[in-house]
A protein has these predicted regions:
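A short, low-complexity linker immediately N-terminal to eukaryotic Hanks-type protein kinase catalytic domains
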Residues: 1-13
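Protein kinase glycine-rich loop
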Residues: 14-20, 25
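Conserved N-lobe motifs of Hanks-type protein kinase catalytic domains
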Residues: 19-20, 66-69
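Conserved N-lobe loop of protein kinases adjacent to the ATP-binding glycine-rich P-loop
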Residues: 29-36
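Activation-segment/catalytic-loop signature of the eukaryotic protein kinase fold
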Residues: 77
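Conserved small/polar residues in nucleotide/adenosyl-binding loops
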Residues: 97-99
């Protein structure tokens, strides 16, 4: 993903927040709801490996089913150029990278 890229005709990437071993996390604007969100994407070298795509999808599904004030909410999931999920953005908290 690149700064300025629009995903699903809805989410505009504005900033790279950080990266983990298998993924990047970006700050984005949800153009439909006019809110800031975070988008986690699988790194390109894992996209071609189905086991990693499935693992990433399970991560999104599992997190989406959790409901706790200390856990970010998952809003959306999809596969464009790479799998991604959209989650609640919390200002100044990079712990969401480690979901």
């Amino acid at each position: 993903m690149q700064i300025g890229q629009i995903i699903k005709e809805r989410y505009e990437i504005t900033q790279l927040l950080g990266e983990g071993g298998m993924s990047y996390v970006y700050k984005a604007i949800d153009k439909q709801l006019q809110r800031t969100v975070a988008i986690k994407t699988l790194k390109p070298n894992y996209v071609e490996q189905e086991k990693f795509v499935e693992r990433f999808k399970r991560e999104a599904q599992t997190a989406a089913n959790l409901n706790h004030p200390n856990i970010v909410q998952i809003f959306d999931w999809g596969i464009g150029d790479e799998p991604f999920f959209v989650m609640e953005y919390i200002e100044g908290n990079l712990s969401l990278i480690h979901i």
